[in-house]
């Protein structure tokens, strides 16, 4: 499945939750979801009954859209999560959170995961001092993620850091804002990852 390129705020209204797809509008409270917290279209305010399969599929789609992951990548991550010891659903969220594009977003260097992905693919991100342009790379504990020197003064990066000051940084990451780098100190616990996703439904879907 190709990445969604349609109206992202319409998508958020369909799922009924913020997917963090519109950074500045989301933080300012001006997103379409803030104004109209119901589905798009003529019958958007009606709540149609959904089957168990429909709920499971919707949850997977929501997670893929939120993190900007293709079906092939998502399934690959699930297979790895299922291989690891522990709860498969929790493993799934932890693995997704370790993706380089997501870590760049979590460090506050971009207002959306999509913008963070562009920083990575365009070669603006260093991992342990070396350029890495693979958004799906799994960051390990202790690794240093840095914005390339020439990009540190980029207005979009600077603005993203200003906006992040309103929301704070997640506890498994340390960031030196002035120097535009951060350390992925440890893997997150599931309860620390605040995302509107019921991973149990995704596990049920893939387990059929």
UniProtKB/Swiss-Prot annotation:
One of its GO terms (biological process) is translation. InterPro entries: Ribosomal_uS4 (IPR022801), Ribosomal_uS4_bac-type (IPR005709), Ribosomal_uS4_CS (IPR018079), Ribosomal_uS4_N (IPR001912), S4_RNA-bd (IPR002942), S4_RNA-bd_sf (IPR036986). The keyword rRNA-binding applies. The keyword Ribonucleoprotein applies. Residues 98-161 form the S4 RNA-binding domain. CDD domains: S4. Keywords: Ribonucleoprotein, Ribosomal protein, RNA-binding, rRNA-binding. GO terms for cellular component: small ribosomal subunit. One of its GO terms (molecular function) is structural constituent of ribosome. It comes from the Bacteria. One of the primary rRNA binding proteins, it binds directly to 16S rRNA where it nucleates assembly of the body of the 30S subunit. HAMAP family: Ribosomal_uS4_B (MF_01306_B). Belongs to the universal ribosomal protein uS4 family. Part of the 30S ribosomal subunit. Contacts protein S5. The interaction surface between S4 and S5 is involved in control of translational fidelity. This is Small ribosomal subunit protein uS4.
């Amino acid at each position: 499945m190709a990445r969604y390129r349609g109206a992202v705020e319409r998508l958020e209204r369909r799922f009924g939750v913020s997917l963090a797809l519109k950074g500045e509008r989301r933080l300012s409270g001006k997103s379409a979801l803030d104004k109209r917290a119901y589905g798009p279209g003529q019958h958007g305010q009606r709540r149609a009954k959904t089957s168990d399969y429909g709920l499971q599929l919707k949850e997977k789609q929501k997670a893929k859209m939120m993190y900007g992951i293709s079906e092939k990548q998502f399934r690959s991550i699930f297979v790895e999560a299922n291989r690891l010891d522990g709860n498969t659903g929790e493993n799934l969220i932890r693995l997704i959170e370790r993706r380089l594009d997501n870590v760049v977003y979590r460090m506050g260097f971009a207002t959306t995961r999509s913008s963070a992905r562009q920083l990575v693919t365009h070669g603006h991100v260093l991992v342990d001092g070396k350029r890495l342009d693979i958004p799906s790379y799994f960051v390990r504990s202790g690794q240093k993620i840095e914005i390339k020197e020439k990009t540190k003064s980029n207005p979009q990066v600077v603005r993203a850091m200003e906006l992040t000051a309103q929301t704070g940084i997640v506890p498994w990451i340390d960031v030196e804002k002035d120097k535009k780098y951060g350390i992925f100190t440890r893997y997150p616990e599931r309860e620390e990852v605040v995302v509107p996703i019921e991973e149990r439904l995704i596990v049920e879907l893939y387990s059929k």
